[in-house]
Amino acid sequence: MGLSTLEQKLTAMVSAPVEALGFEFVGLEFIRGRVSTLRIYIDSEEGITVDDCADVSHQVSAVLDVEDPIQTFYNLEISSPGLERPLFTTTHYEQFIGEEVAVVLRIAMQNRRKWQGIIKSVAGEMITVTVDGKDEVFALSNIQKANLVPHF
């Protein structure tokens, strides 16, 4: 997923404190609004508890308070990736080859921004998704948002 400059800066700042606590830093998203939201996704093999989220929130808040990279009011949310796991990196796409994904593009391809299909392959920064039997290739930098599609 192509991250904004702010999201890149935030990732550089918060990934180390998250990992120092023993968690996987999955990724983050900054959602602008009247009150913006900084959502940080963490994971571990044992799963994530509310206490884990509180510990990470405390640690990350301390870093953000010192560095002060966000020049507006915002809420900090710490979350597990959940069933509709967001995909941020090529490693995430490689990990979930064969799984269904919903993709929203920054710039439309073939007059559409929303796509859904099966992750087929990853080559460099290019993601191939099979949509209705046809392979579509997306540049990671053009992916605004991507989530796994759970099946129940």
UniProtKB/Swiss-Prot annotation:
Q: What does this protein do?
A: Required for maturation of 30S ribosomal subunits.
What this protein is called in its record is Ribosome maturation factor RimP
Under Gene3D superfamilies, the record lists: Ribosome maturation factor RimP, C-terminal domain, RimP-like superfamily, N-terminal
Q: Which GO terms describe its biological process?
A: ribosomal small subunit assembly; translation
Q: Name one Pfam family in it.
A: RimP_N
Q: Which CDD domains match?
A: YlxS_C (cd01734)
From the broadest rank down, the organism's phylogenetic lineage runs: Bacteria, Pseudomonadati, Pseudomonadota, Gammaproteobacteria, Enterobacterales
Q: Where is this protein localized, as stated in its record?
A: Cytoplasm
Q: Which family does it belong to?
A: Belongs to the RimP family.
- Keyword Cytoplasm attributed: yes
- Provide GO CC annotations from the record: cytosol
**Which keywords belong to this entry?**
Cytoplasm, Ribosome biogenesis
